[in-house]
Structure formats: C-alpha cells, structure tokens
From Swiss-Prot:
One of its GO terms (cellular component) is cytosol. One of its GO terms (biological process) is ribosomal small subunit assembly. This is Ribosome maturation factor RimP. It is found in: Cytoplasm. Disulfide bonds: none annotated.
C-alpha cells in the first residue's frame, strides 16, 4: 500500500475528511484533516478540528506508517485552517454560499484571481462578485481552477472590550485622593 493510501484509509477510518497530504523537505509528511459535518466525535460537538483530533490521528498514523514501512522523519497533522483549500467537488458543494478566493489556470477578462460567493450551477459552479462597478457572475468548472480557498472570516464584534476606568475622585485643589 502506498503512503497516500495508508494515510487516507487511516484518516477516513476515524471519520475525518482528508483535505490534503503532502511531502516536504527533509522527510516531512504533512496531513490536513477536517471534521465531517453531522458526524459525532469523541471531543464533543463542534465543526472545527481540535488538538485532541490531531493527536488521535497522529498516534494511529505513526503506527500505520511504521507497519507499512513508509519512509518519513517528521509527521505533522493539523486542521486546514480558516483559509481551507477546496479540492474536490464535494468541497465546493459543502461550502456553496461561502466567500472564496479562486485562481484560474487561464485568465478571464485579463484576470486569474477572483473573490466572491460560491454557488452551484448544474454540473458547473458560479462565483458571484462585484468588480467595483457592477455585480457579475463567473461560471467555471473544476478543471479550470488552479487554486480555491475559503476567505477567512474573523469576527471581533462579539468580543467585549475593557470597561473604561472611572476617573479618580478629585479633592478641592486638584489633587487625587
């Protein structure tokens, strides 16, 4: 069994999605996992990969890769991050309605990079975006895409700031108490 097949079988066996796996320099094997929507996990509910998820997959992968005699010196297992790549058709279906960055293989209207909201369109996909003048729709297939990633959304509006300190009581003469 190849190292890719061993990694995929192990990750999916635990109920996670294998987003990407790659070999780096100096024997690095990097694996990105994600939780499958609707699946129940030991670490509790939540849509994001936890440290415990990564630890569990790492321990099993170390064992499997040793048994399969796969050559590597370092193993990294992590979540794909907020800017998760979209690789498969299932990824596009899962994240339809989300804001994405897309890079095309060939330029369209003089550009390769676009940002907008992903939508399904039969067998193909659409990106709804505004070019600064008007709303536009870019139709594309997965074969035309070089790279696609979710646009990270970081919301600080729910965070409460520190309450302003009350001014010190003033005594006549301008001195603080």
């Amino acid at each position: 069994m190849s190292w890719q097949a061993a990694v995929e079988k192990t990750v999916t066996g635990f109920g996670y999605e294998l987003v990407e796996c790659e070999r780096g320099s100096q024997g690095l094997l990097r694996v990105f996992i994600d939780r499958v929507p609707g699946q129940v996990y030991d670490g509790g509910p939540g849509e994001f990969v936890t440290v415990e998820d990564c630890e569990k997959v790492t321990r099993q992968l170390q064992y499997v890769l040793e048994v399969e005699n796969c050559d590597y010196s370092r193993l990294e297992v992590s979540s794909p991050g907020l800017d998760r790549p979209l690789k498969k058709s299932a990824d596009y279906a899962r994240f339809a309605g989300e804001r994405i960055d897309i890079t095309l293989k060939l330029p369209f209207q003089g550009r390769k990079k676009y940002q907008g909201v992903l939508a399904a369109s039969g067998e193909a996909w659409e990106l709804h975006f505004n070019d600064g003048k008007q709303d536009q729709v870019l139709g594309f297939t997965l074969e035309e895409v070089r790279d696609a990633r979710l646009v990270p959304v970081v919301d600080f509006k729910g965070r409460k700031g520190k309450e302003p300190a009350e001014p010190a009581a003033q005594v006549p003469g301008g001195y603080e108490q």
